[in-house]
Design a protein with these regions (language model features):
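Conserved Class I S-adenosyl-L-methionine-dependent methyltransferase catalytic core
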Residues: 3, 10-32, 36-42, 50-51, ...
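Alpha-helical subdomain
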Residues: 1-74, 160, 165, 169-332
Length: 332
């Protein structure tokens, strides 16, 4: 039996209930460009309000709260970014968390959680093509920020013997495709994603100087073919956006895109049979409830079943350092 969790105190429950306040303060400041406006300087709240086009009194109250949170400092009526804010929240800094703009957009979808639980479906439309341009750019930036940090380790767990062609389905910025071509000389990769995403993909790939090794193909993986003769078809953070039937069909398409001996590799939150671990996956399932038409987090048995039905053999699972797992199957 797993060890019992100590009971939550009244104060801990209140802290959970009010945790949204600090989150909203940070996201509002980020959305307004407050940290970037401060930069490395020292400014009055009135000066910042003038720069970002906000009410002076309300801006001072916001900045005072940011001081209490450790994100700003205040001395003689002038505010500065803390070291952490300078490193992570100022747009030109190397460690800039540009993906937080996607979190700003997630706030809107999460406010619909009560209605989503009542009705069983998210309020928002599923496809990126139906999103506004700003949403799409922020989403891809958020995924890129995380993927660039995680991709080398994730790809490093995959046996690349005899691999020369990789298809990254729904590859977004191309971070994983770029990790594949960097992991082994002679590998070429193709990113398959929606027509509205591909121009963003090309921009990220060009900035990394990998346009000769990473190709792009526009399409909708639910409706279009994926090509053929790939050694690996890779799906990272894809299946959670889809329904079980959509995933079964998608894995079938991926299998058809393989050479004999090739593999489909799925990376995602893979839940236990009780759907309680990993714990991050339980929360992410709600993110899919409010943000997609029919997405979810799935169990190992579900993913393995789709692979077996698609004719893949030797289905196996391995964990990653990031709370996700890889499940792979081979076409014999």
């Amino acid at each position: 039996m797993p060890p019992e969790t100590p009971p939550l105190t009244r104060e801990q429950i209140r802290n959970i209930a009010y945790a949204f306040q600090e989150s909203r303060i940070l996201l509002t400041a980020h959305e307004l460009g407050l940290f970037t406006a401060l930069g490395s300087g020292r400014h009055t709240s009135a000066g910042i309000a003038s720069m970002i086009g906000t009410d002076p009194r309300a801006t001072e109250r916001l900045m005072n709260a940011l001081c209490a949170m450790g994100l700003l400092t205040k001395e003689n009526g002038r505010f500065s970014n803390s070291q952490g804010a300078r490193e992570c929240l100022v747009q030109d800094s190397p460690g800039y968390l540009g993906g937080l703009m996607h979190t700003v957009h997630l706030w809107d979808t999460w406010t619909t959680l009560t209605e989503a639980v009542r009705t069983g479906t998210g309020v928002r439309l599923r496809t990126v093509e139906q999103k506004q341009e700003q949403w799409r750019s922020a989403f891809i930036a958020a995924m890129h920020d995380r993927a660039m940090r995680q991709a080398p380790a994730v790809v490093g767990q995959i046996d690349l013997s005899n691999v020369t062609r990789v298809l990254d389905v729904g590859g977004g910025s191309g971070a994983y495709a770029m990790a594949f071509v960097r992991a082994k000389a002679g590998i070429s990769a193709t990113v398959f994603d929606l027509p509205g995403v591909i121009p963003l993909t090309r921009g990220y790939v060009e900035r990394e100087g990998l346009s000769q090794s990473v190709a792009t193909v526009p399409g909708d993986y639910l409706n279009d073919g994926l090509g053929k003769d790939f050694d690996i078809v890779f799906l990272s953070a894809i299946i959670h956006s889809n329904s079980p039937s959509e995933n079964a069909e998608l894995i079938m398409k991926c299998a058809r895109a393989l050479r004999p001996g090739g593999r489909v590799v799925v990376q995602d939150f893979i839940m236990d049979e009780e759907r309680l671990t990993p714990s991050a996956g339980t929360i992410f399932a709600l993110n899919m409830l409010v943000g997609t038409e029919s997405g979810d987090t799935y169990t190992e048995a579900e993913v393995s079943g789709w692979m077996t039905a698609a004719g893949l053999s030797g289905v196996s699972r391995q964990g990653t350092p990031f709370g996700t797992s890889q499940i792979s199957g081979r076409l014999i």
